[in-house]
Amino acid sequence: MKRGEVRWAEHPDWPRRPALVLTRNEAIDHLNEVFVVLATTNVRGLPTEVELGTEDGMPRACVLNADHVASLPKGYLGDLIVTLGSERLAEVCRALDRATGC
């Protein structure tokens, strides 16, 4: 598991959905949980959304919603869907900045 990977999240309380791993690579092996941004097909056009599509390697169009982040146990993250490049990760970081104001 690495930063930038989009994996299937299998949380018992949520429908199965893609989740982008944002935890830094140096920490992943030492942690039980990782920080993720969850994807949804419910596109609202918010400045905190990053659109992804089949051209990005996703199975269908969706958005990564920086207003919907979570710390998930690594065991909840399953198969790899795609690894995002640095430009896409930068878009997600800008969306997180807008979402949190940090």
What role is predicted for each listed range?
Residues 3-4, 51, 77:
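Residue-level detector of alpha-helix boundaries and kinks
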Residues 1-9:
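Short coil-to-beta transition motif at edge beta-strands of beta-rich domains
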